[in-house]
């Protein structure tokens, strides 16, 4: 008897919640869908090796060089930041900025180092909650017209130990 009463009470409590649940908004969906567009980029290129990414640098130096190229590219109206073929670049977190297309060319490897100090605290979300956390490998905040392209390899640097 008590089990049956409990079930009826739970049903009575849950019914209003179902009625109040947010329904699918087809108009909102269409509005979001229509706002999506192909990013636009200026026809300029920035080769990361021209900004200090030498083939024998540390992860911190590669990170600074890559970020310098990204920052300059965005500041000058956007374009393509190129990670050149034939090299492996060990780096820390990279923050994309508006107007930047990060192209990892075929034969290039962009590998993220397991060095926590190379991943600054950034504003992010986790399971829908706004929070501050260590930066992901590639991060962008309030940026428009960004992309990662190319046939190269992006290696998150994960292992059985991380």
Q: What is each model feature region?
A:
Residues 2-7, 12, 19-101, 105-162:
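Extracellular "leader-to-stem" segments immediately downstream of a signal peptide or signal-anchor
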